[in-house]
Amino acid sequence: MALSSQDKPKQSLNSRIAYALTDRKILHFRYDAHLRQQVMKQLSKTQRELLNRLAAAGVDALPKKQLDTLLKELKQEVAKVYQEMTAYTQDELSGFFTAETQHLHQLYNDEVGFDFFNQVPEYKQKANKTATIIAGSPLEDWWAKQGNDFAFKFEGIIRQGLLDGQQTSQMITDVKHLMNTSRRHAETLVITAVAKVADKAHQALRDENLDILAGEKHLSTLDTRTSTVCQLRDGLMWDLDKKPIDHDVPYQRPPLHPRCRSILQLVTKSWKELGIDAEEMPSSTRASQDSPVSEQINYENWLKSKSPEQQDQVLGKGKADLWRRG
């Protein structure tokens, strides 16, 4: 964390963990940006090839049999690239899950100050490397759906364009609009998949440390892009039986919606609840664990805890200067 040592005693342990997790989320954003860049390279390359094939063939003058053959070949190319993106993202996210599980274990223990949280055993990490499930469906199915939707609409543009007497150039323009939409959908899927795998790692750490936890707390990234549902849930807690604590909002694991940036923080019990003699512990650790949370953890407070250089890195220098000037 980037908080100074003199700031730490003012915060509870759970508050410090929240700040550290917010730091961690920035790394998630960078990772999903890397994944999106790689996916866009694959997708854009294939889409350029489709446009070149359409232009070279002059589809507005093709006999029906040749048109059917061309469309079949192009749809096969679309299916192939989406299968490749599925394999690539699944492999990447499998490695990300392992790394995230290990980093979260280290993060929580670093903030506690000693080896407090149990690590997720390697055999459980391997068992958890199953298909990423988003809104009830495997990532593979989401990619297949996007590929099928694109192929269906692509063929529809060509066939309807011919019925309407359009020139090849007009149909290519419509296909380009479809491609822009498909790229946005692919980006959204990558962002959401990274968030889901990160949550899965958090859940694995939780299940390994139920005896020291009081529950889970929803942490939203609070800025102008925060959804209403995430604003509502920010700061709310649930016990380990998923029952709301002092509210009536039902328990739900993130991502709550496409591009969701929320997380569920693990909230530790107090030393007293754990049956630990706090007098035998370092005073800084003892005080931070049992003190109340000093402030609401949100994006604004988190940014204020960063150095100007770190603020520039997160926001970009221009936006950071504007933010610092209010």
Regions found by a protein language model. Give the residues of each.
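Acidic, metal/cofactor-coordinating or nucleic-acid-engaging core segments within structured domains
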Residues: 177
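Acidic, glycine-rich two-metal-ion catalytic cores of nucleic acid-processing enzymes
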Residues: 180-282
